Structure formats: structure tokens, C-alpha cells
Amino acid sequence: MTDTPTRIYVDADACPVKDEIYRVALRHSVPVSVVAGNFIRVPQDPLIERIAAGAGMDAADDWIAERARPGDVVVTSDIPLASRCVKAGADVIAPNGKPFTEQSIGMTLAVRNLMTDLRSAGEVTGGPRSFAPRDRSTFLSALDQTLRRIQRRRIDAAATSQNSSQG
């Protein structure tokens, strides 16, 4: 855990829960970087910054992956980006509320790659299910719990550090 404050990075181009992220972030006083390849409208608030990462295919993903670190939260449905951020130590949540973890990301990435191969071979024609109202609720709960967990880890780390310096 680092001493720099927690930040939420949003892979924003197709993110259906941006408004929910803003509400939770403002309630917790956590800064948000809304990263997109194109212009995207964000609320006027000092805690919310818009990042135009450029038009390159993975420009937004690269921008986020280069900055994500332990204590940060990344919101993305992009599985390769999620993998990079999990490896960097960030907490990663999909817009449907599903967490990507060190334990789950390998299998998730393998399934994604398999489905991509099957689609390109014409074996699978459907995609993921549609975003549902319950996904929004699950996401809100997951983001709030993740921010609380990070805050507890910071408090515990500070207490441990203080105790070891006294002992």
C-alpha cells in the first residue's frame, strides 16, 4: 500500500456506470480519472478529471495500466486491461460489479481468448448478456465495499507502522 491517495480510474468509452462512480467517489472524497479515447462529458468537480488518452487502439487502456497501483480502483469491462491492472496491484471491478482478482483473472482471460477464437471461426455468434438494472446495484455495492476495504487496509498499515516505530 502506498502513501498516495486512492484514485478511481474509469475505462470510460463504453462504461454504463459513470454516474454511479461519480456519486460513490464524491461520497468517499476519492478522485476519479475518467479516461477515454474520445471527448466525454464529466461533471464539473475538482475530484473528477477527464483524460483524453488519444485515438490509438489501446491508448486509454495503456494510460490506465501505466498509472494503476495498489490502493487504486480500476473500473473496466476490458479483460486484458483488467489483467494488467490486477498484476499492478490495483483493485479492479467490472461495470456489472464482478471483481477481477489475482485468483480469477487467468481463467477469465483464457475464456475471453477462447470466445474470441470461437467467434472468429463462426462457432459463436452471441456476445455477453445485456447490462441489467441489478448490475447497476451490484456495481454500486462492489465499488463502495472496495473503497471501504482499501481504507481499512490503509488504517491497518498505518497502525502497524506506528506500532513498529514505537516498539
From Swiss-Prot:
**InterPro entries per UniProt:** UPF0178
Q: Which residue positions does the secretion signal occupy?
A: none
- NCBIfam families given in the database record: PRK00124.1
The family note in this entry says: Belongs to the UPF0178 family.
Q: Return the protein name.
A: UPF0178 protein bll3966
Q: Which organism is it from?
A: Bradyrhizobium diazoefficiens (strain JCM 10833 / BCRC 13528 / IAM 13628 / NBRC 14792 / USDA 110)
